[in-house]
Amino acid sequence: MKKASIVLLFWLLAGATPAIAAPVADWVQTDRVQFSGTDGFFRSQGVASDGQSLFFSWNLGLSRTEIDDTSVVLADNTTGAIPADLAESNHNHIGDIDYAWGWIYAPIEDGPEYAEPWVVIYDAETLQPTGQRYLLPASIQRDGVPWIAVDQARGVAYSMEWNDTGKLFVYNLSNFELLRTVTLSQPAPRIQGAKIYKGDLYASRDNGSEKSIVAINPETGTVTHLFDRNFGDDYEAEGIAFVRRSSGTMMVATGIREGAHGYTEMRIYRIGGDMTAPVLSRPRFGKAKVRRGTKAILLAGASEPVTATYRWARCIGPRSKPCLQIRNFGIPRRIEMSEGSNRVALPTGALRPGIWNLLLTPVDRADITGRSARLGLRVIRPRR
């Protein structure tokens, strides 16, 4: 299936545009990685992640590393990533990249003329060009294309100008035709990189000594200042990315400390600095047997506020081994649980008489997944 068809299919299956919650502001730095030698050059622009590895860009190339040990290089195209014909036409700068569907989306500029801003698609495994690329309108991307951000849920991609940043450009992800322009609530110049996280566009700015992180609502254009990093004037902020894993979401941001003792680095942030998984204590049903159509009362303690995903599964087997097989039923659903004791009434009208399992998995606001619990429940026939 061609890429454009895959993108269109995903967009149609995604359904309605996701609701946007208030952007997260309490990111706390929990780690820092400094790159030495040639790695400092090769990781000096953008960063992206598929949750399994990290992708880095610099002016002329791309590389892929392990997340937890960036010294382990998994793929290397650091010196010849720009297609030959573009390199011959003075395209000399890869900006902040993004990942989606097994591809890397790389913005490539031809400064200082900025006559042809391209988005070039690469295979994320090999970091080789796929042959698909899209020319953005130079009439609006007047000083190149510093970054590209892919919004899979909405089927679009975003970019902006670097200096005159009162507008957000929204491109059709299947062909990169301009769909619309969103006017920002306030200018946000010198954005070096941006990524979508839970519906908002989070951006890293190279603004003075502050080096701010801001969030942009891509539908309304509302700009929310999240926090300043205050790294000083001799620091150049670069790319930004989100690493989503069961151990929680990390926001990573790259930057360059200039001067005689300069270096390139990546700083790692977590929501509230949280690195501890949530725990459910004594999850159980109030009654082990309920009549179909009544409520099954779920009781559980929670170590912190969580969103718990639950799904029913029907037990199949003989009386001696009633759960010899387990067959999932319905779709996963979510319930909110507060810190401390919780009592949740779950409907059973769709459950046929028999033995059922409930798989309950807590996730906290830092996106850390706790240990799942499997609870048994017998459903009997309703009274006549």
Which functions belong to the PLM regions below?
Residues 320-351:
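Glycine-centered tight-turn motifs at strand-turn-strand junctions
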Residues 51-52, 101-102, 153-155, 198-200, ...:
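Short coil/turn segments that connect the beta-strands within blades of beta-propeller domains
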Residues 71-108:
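Blade-loop segments of beta-propeller domains
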Residues 61-66, 113-121, 165-170, 209-215, ...:
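Structural motif
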Residues 238-275:
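Blade-level signature of beta-propeller repeat domains, shared across WD40, Kelch, NHL, RCC1
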Residues 41-48, 87-96, 138-150, 187-196, ...:
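Repeated scaffold domains used in trafficking and secretory/extracellular systems
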Residues 33-60, 93:
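Beta-strand-rich domains and repeat architectures in extracellular enzymes and scaffolds
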